[in-house]
A protein has these predicted regions:
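Short, basic/aromatic recognition patches that contact phosphate-bearing ligands
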Residues: 1-79
């Protein structure tokens, strides 16, 4: 399995397994393959989200507190 495929599988599992939204920093810390500086991690994550969406996987984006404009979080709602 390629590194990218492994990272996409691990990202999918992490986003499915959580009940709350995961921040990018949590994702970058917990999923192997997000390496380099912050900008390269961001670009990689955006490509990964696009790849998952092109496969029909719906990624929810939400915040932790609707009153405050907190950092966005991500999850996949189980069907």
């Amino acid at each position: 399995m390629s590194r990218k495929s492994e990272r996409l599988v691990n990202l999918t599992i992490a986003l499915l397994a959580t009940r709350r939204y995961l921040t990018k920093s949590e994702i970058f810390r917990s999923i192997e393959g997000y390496e380099g500086n912050d900008e390269s991690k961001e670009r990689m994550f955006e490509r990964d989200k696009d790849d998952l969406r092109s496969l029909g996987i719906e990624i929810e984006v939400g915040g932790f507190d609707p009153i405050f404009n907190d950092e966005a979080g991500y999850r996949i709602k189980p069907e």
